[in-house]
Amino acid sequence: MELRVIEKTDTELRIEIAGEDHTFMNVLKGVLLETDDVAAATYDMNPEQSGGQTEPVLTVKSESGDPLDVLAEGAESITDRTGALRDAVKAA
């Protein structure tokens, strides 16, 4: 997975996440929307200016915090959830 920051302000981040598809991006977006400091989270697989299919571009808007910190918190939440699922499957 390769990340490329397209645009970043104090409360907004646009970042390309190379090598991912709708499956991962939907999970990431969903987790971000459950995060307290997130005002908005969305992604686009086909940005208007691209002229066609591109790598997904994630947009995160925070209420007040650094959007990179919010993204890191979302990634940590995914790690925790998949770990809990793995443990439950092993225990089954």
Swiss-Prot record:
The protein's UniProt keywords, in alphabetical order, are: Cytoplasm, DNA-directed RNA polymerase, Nucleotidyltransferase, Transcription, Transferase
InterPro entries this protein is in?
RBP11-like (IPR036603), RBP11-like_dimer (IPR009025), RNA_pol_Rpb11_13-16kDa_CS (IPR008193), Rpo11-like (IPR022905)
Asked whether the keyword Transferase is assigned, the reply is: yes
Q: Which domain of life is it from?
A: Archaea
What this protein catalyses is: RNA(n) + a ribonucleoside 5'-triphosphate = RNA(n+1) + diphosphate
Q: Name one GO molecular function term.
A: DNA binding
Q: What is its EC number?
A: 2.7.7.6
Q: Does the keyword rRNA processing apply?
A: no
Where does it reside?
Cytoplasm
Enzyme's top EC category: transferase
Q: Which GO terms describe its cellular component?
A: cytoplasm; DNA-directed RNA polymerase complex
Q: SUPFAM superfamilies of this UniProt entry?
A: RBP11-like subunits of RNA polymerase
User: What is the role of the protein in this entry?
Assistant: DNA-dependent RNA polymerase (RNAP) catalyzes the transcription of DNA into RNA using the four ribonucleoside triphosphates as substrates.
**Protein family membership:** Belongs to the archaeal Rpo11/eukaryotic RPB11/RPC19 RNA polymerase subunit family.
Q: What is said about its interaction partners and assembly?
A: Part of the RNA polymerase complex.
The protein's name: DNA-directed RNA polymerase subunit Rpo11
- According to its UniProt entry, this protein's organism is Halorubrum lacusprofundi (strain ATCC 49239 / DSM 5036 / JCM 8891 / ACAM 34)
Q: Which gene encodes it?
A: rpo11
